[in-house]
Amino acid sequence: MAKRDYYEVLGISKSASADEIKKAYRKLSKQYHPDINKEAGADEKFKEISEAYEVLSDSQKRAQYDQYGHVDPNQGFGGGAGGGFSGGGFSGFEDIFDTFFGGGGRQQDPNAPRQGSDLQYTMRLKFKEAVFGKDAEIEIPREENCDTCHGSGAKPGTTPEKCSHCGGKGSINVEQNTPFGRVVNKRTCQYCNGTGKEIKEKCSTCHGKGRVTKTKKIKVKVPAGVNDGQQMRVSGEGEAGINGGPNGDLYVVFVVIPDEFFEREADDIYVEVPITFVQATLGDEIDVPTVHGKVRLKIPSGTQTGTTFRLRGKGVPHLRGNGTGDQHVIVKVIVPKKLDDKQKEILREFASTTGDRVDEQTSGFFDKMKRAFKGD
């Protein structure tokens, strides 16, 4: 089944800005997150949304996607728990240079130490876990050197021999006719797969590979203030190096589960709090939830719906450096839908005492609305 266009998945245009991409992702992820949406297919929809955001939120991946579209999973845009990083490279150009120049100067020693592959792990965090951080233990499937043969691939007591086909070089010369004449092309030796070694008696544990897949438990300290889509490198926790080379690294990518009440923008938090029209008119003090605990907020008399109050220092700790963001409280005045006769009479009496007048600010709003209708 063909993948949908990432821009279509997020419901945005191809010219969308980074902020528009982020807003679209937050809206959709909140709508389809499996912890919130229990409908059939919500989980797959959420994965599709997350994949689209992972690519389009990264300028380099987005540019590659805009140019080439969906590519083979082994050649980029990798992801998922424990999934490795890989790149497409320039193999096509290398083949051309190999053909005309015989691959001269690019041959590498097959026995030289090489760094192991990097790994990627996706960690899902609750909203408050991302705000305050946490200590976590994760399990990573990765390739490690075989303990039985110590990575040689040979049966204990034996050693790998030099490949008899390539002489230990890991490559062989192949003559090829081209429009420019006969050239010599270097190809990876198919008998030793480029290792330059030949194993007569293979290790019974790894079957000659020298590596086995193991599940490793790793402790990860999630820093306070981490945001959705950010990643953290755990040095040396990738796959084992080859020929004594260093291990690769592990990259932990954070996916923050949207909260049903708190909304985050950078290190600030936004919430909507309902108040009654009586509280808005006469003023009051209300309790407002924050990630740091309950806070008492004074509502001045005459507060209008949409008014925003700032609670300083009640947001998200800065990931780099000291300080904390703020929480913005947006009040929504709730008008009662059902009133009994006595309540209606009280309101009518109130209206008669005011003469149905509106204050200057409200008058100004209606004047602007009238001018808009007239086209002034």
From Swiss-Prot:
GO terms for biological process: chaperone cofactor-dependent protein refolding; DNA replication; protein refolding; response to heat. Its main location: cytoplasm. Binds 2 Zn(2+) ions per monomer. It is found in: Cytoplasm. CXXCXGXG motif repeats lie at residues 146-153, 163-170, 189-196, 203-210. Zn(2+) 2 binds at C163, C166, C189, C192. One of its GO terms (molecular function) is unfolded protein binding. CDD domains: DnaJ, DnaJ_C, DnaJ_zf. PROSITE patterns: DNAJ_1, DNAJ_2, ZF_CR. InterPro entries: DnaJ, DnaJ_C, DnaJ_domain, DnaJ_domain_CS, HSP40/DnaJ_pept-bd, HSP_DnaJ_Cys-rich_dom, HSP_DnaJ_Cys-rich_dom_sf, J_dom_sf. Keywords: Chaperone, Cytoplasm, DNA replication, Metal-binding, Repeat, Stress response, Zinc, Zinc-finger. One of its GO terms (cellular component) is cytoplasm. Signal peptide: none annotated. Its cofactor is Zn(2+). A zinc finger (CR-type) spans 133-215. Residues 5-69 form the J domain. The J domain is necessary and sufficient to stimulate DnaK ATPase activity. Zinc center 1 plays an important role in the autonomous, DnaK-independent chaperone activity of DnaJ. Zinc center 2 is essential for interaction with DnaK and for DnaJ activity. Belongs to the DnaJ family. Homodimer. Participates actively in the response to hyperosmotic and heat shock by preventing the aggregation of stress-denatured proteins and by disaggregating proteins, also in an autonomous, DnaK-independent fashion. Unfolded proteins bind initially to DnaJ; upon interaction with the DnaJ-bound protein, DnaK hydrolyzes its bound ATP, resulting in the formation of a stable complex. GrpE releases ADP from DnaK; ATP binding to DnaK triggers the release of the substrate protein, thus completing the reaction cycle. NCBIfam families: DnaJ_bact (TIGR02349), PRK10767.1 (NF008035), PRK14276.1 (NF010869), PRK14280.1 (NF010873). This is Chaperone protein DnaJ. The gene is dnaJ.
